[in-house]
């Protein structure tokens, strides 16, 4: 299995590790390493963790941190979910339910430097992604995400790059420190239960106003009913929330599409 290392530089983030100057000159052997187990959540959404299907739903609704009950149980949970069931209606053969991540952080006067290391779960290098192949007449796409119909039917191989995504909050998003990404994943979003239809998106005032053609991650504060993506607040209301810092930074590193040019996507989650 191939080990992948990713180093990201993020402005104005406080970290409690060794001082650094330039990413290329950091001696990572002197920076403390935190070992974290990541697990596959399937389609466990904001709504699911607050429903009767989740034994800890009342605690979640009361603001209890997920780690209160699940710390140290990540691998077992991921291994169970990935096999299939209500939280994974389309299990992928051979997919691992968890991953071991090594995390390091350093900083200087201007930037924070985050380094992540893990072993790819793919049979090929984690930098592999969709190809264009010439069949003698035309160029055709070869390889698709494993949940795509053509892969599920065996007509195309499942080929997709490794990715590393982090969300960062400065304390202004209620419950994010306790429940993290479960505030952002909702029923109705892409690849989630009750996925949106094109007609629903086209008829939605907020998504039309912000020129979106599908439903992605959002924070509860952006909806009048946090559990209903259709109930978006006005553009003016959301602009006020954003101006007050009520969003989380979303940074995505892609082993194929961004690593080659030494970059990562700089986004955010709110609406």
Task: Briefly describe each language-model feature range.
Residues 1-19:
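Gram-negative bacterial Sec-dependent N-terminal signal peptides
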Residues 21-63, 77-104, 127:
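Sequence context of c-type cytochrome heme-c attachment sites
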Residues 75-79, 193-194:
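Extracellular/mature segments of secreted proteins
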Residues 70, 80, 181:
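Histidine-centered active-site/metal-ligand motif
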Residues 11, 62-65, 177, 181:
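Secretory pathway export signals and precursors
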Residues 96-270:
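Surface-exposed, glycine/proline- and aromatic-rich loop segments on solvent-exposed faces
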């Amino acid at each position: 299995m191939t080990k992948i290392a990713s180093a990201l530089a993020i402005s104005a983030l406080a970290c409690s590790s060794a001082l650094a100057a330039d990413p290329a000159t950091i001696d990572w052997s002197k920076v403390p390493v935190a070992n974290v187990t990541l697990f596959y959540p399937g389609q466990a959404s904001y709504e699911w963790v607050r429903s009767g299907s989740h034994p800890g739903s009342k605690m979640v609704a009361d603001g209890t941190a997920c780690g209160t009950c699940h710390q140290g149980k990540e691998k077992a949970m991921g291994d169970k979910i990935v096999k299939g069931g209500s939280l994974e209606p389309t299990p992928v053969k051979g997919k691992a339910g968890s991953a071991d991540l090594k995390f390091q952080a350093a900083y200087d006067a201007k930037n924070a430097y985050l380094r992540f290391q893990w072993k790819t779960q793919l049979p090929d290098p984690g930098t592999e992604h969709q190809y264009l192949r010439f069949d003698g007449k035309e160029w055709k796409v070869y390889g698709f995400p494993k949940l795509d119909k053509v892969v599920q039917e065996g007509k195309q191989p499942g080929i997709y790059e490794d990715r590393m995504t982090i969300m960062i909050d400065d304390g202004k998003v209620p419950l994010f420190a306790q429940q993290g990404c479960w505030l952002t994943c909702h029923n109705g979003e892409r690849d989630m239960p009750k996925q949106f239809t094109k007609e629903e998106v086209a008829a939605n005032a907020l998504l039309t106003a912000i020129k979106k053609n599908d439903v992605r991650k959002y924070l509860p504060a952006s909806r009048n009913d946090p559990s209903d993506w259709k109930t978006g607040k006005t553009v003016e209301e959301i602009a006020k929330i954003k101006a007050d810092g009520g969003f989380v930074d979303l940074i995505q590193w892609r082993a194929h599409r961004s690593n080659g040019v030494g970059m990562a996507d700089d986004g955010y989650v709110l609406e």
